[in-house]
Amino acid sequence: MHNVPGRGPHNAAHADSQERLARSPSMIRVFGHYISRIFIGLGAIEFCVLWLSLLAGYYIRLEARLEQFVAPFQTVSALAFGYAGITVLAMIAVGLYQRGLPWGAGFVLRILMAFGMSFTATVLLFYTIPHVTLGRGVVGLTFLFSLVGVLSVRSLFLRFAGSDVFHHRVLVLGVGRNAASVRDLEGPDQLFRVVGFVNVGEPGDVIPAPRQVRLESSLVDLMVARDADELVVAVDDRRKRLPVDDILDCKMSGMQVMDLVSFFEKEASLVNLDVLQPSWLIFSPGFQRRPLVDAGKRALDLVGASVMLAVGLPVMTAVAFGVWIESRGRGPILFHQTRVGLGGRPFRLHKFRSMRADAEADGVARWATVGDPRVTRFGRFIRKTRLDELPQLFNVLRGEMSLVGPRPERPEFVADLSSRLRFYSERHRVKPGLTGWAQLNYQYGSSVDDAKKKLEYDLYYVKNTSLFLDLVILLETVEIVLWGKGAR
């Protein structure tokens, strides 16, 4: 164990260091789910810009000409509040609050789509309020102010996005394979920067020498010298190489100390299987079934599935007709398949048929692949837009599935993956879903490596299940449908 020189009460320098290190956390945890404080701040600023845009558009247009018809400020302010909230939600839905979104035509298109969605909802909202006029002039001015305001805010945000203001500084304890996993996670889209990898005498170091730092005094002094916000413990062999006294000194000095699995959970929103130990699953908060949350999820499933079926009935009819036309009336419109659900129990899943009727005539289960020849032309469209999944709303109503959860797999795949991947069966602790956290964050899987990566996201969801996370996933699924991400 590494000995720390001069342990005991901190001197004045250490007291000053505590003030320097007392910075806001990079992530805020809401019902277990990590959200970047940067995007929370960005959303709050844009909310204010949108709120002011409608107020300005309304009063500039109507105050001088129709003073007798101008509604009280409180009423218009409340409606502007609703407009701003709807627009921010629409911006989340089209992916405008995600890391690494490039500036360009696609960015502007997303903003225009978000504004189109929000203006439609806001106009309907305005017409439910008596004595409030919302003409084309108000809509035009509000749109202009909103567009200029949001683009200006985003321009400033992107200008400073690469600065240290938006990143927290991480010191990694270790230079082996575990430390290398942090190095591999680094990238321009991440909200952290590694300021050094501390060499504590591990054999078989993987980190290049220029990035290594020696522990010459204490970890507290090194954290201060490197202006680090967080210490990540990533030593390969904790039993022999872990400087417990140093780490405890950092913790007791008010510095943030995090184990490697929790660091990945916070920064990548997944549970890293390569460094996961069973003890973390046991002692880490989460992985709890709460009756109130389960009841809330079931209520959301029933209401959401019923509304989606009612609204989507014309679409489902059109899809069914499209499948029938392409197959020239031969072959079934619906496709039924056994999948594994809650507790490992099998159930019968329904989909619109997107492949040839003889896709698995030999009886061998296969993953879909890129450009799979078994997929029909119309089937490719409904797979890309996820319209083939709509019949699963009936599975949701029957309680076999939820709107949100890990995607259900076939028994053949489950048996194989359970023998290859640790903790694979844990994804069956919750109901399978129509959409899920893995679907938002990873492409369609067609290999064991893909299944492993998706399992890491599924375990994050199982650990942090909440109504809030379900609503976030449902909202962000809109982008997946609009842009056809991950379909094969």
Residue ranges and their predicted role:
Residues 2-165, 297, 488:
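Signature of alpha-helical transmembrane segments in polytopic membrane proteins
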Residues 368-431, 473-481:
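A short, structured surface patch at a secondary-structure boundary
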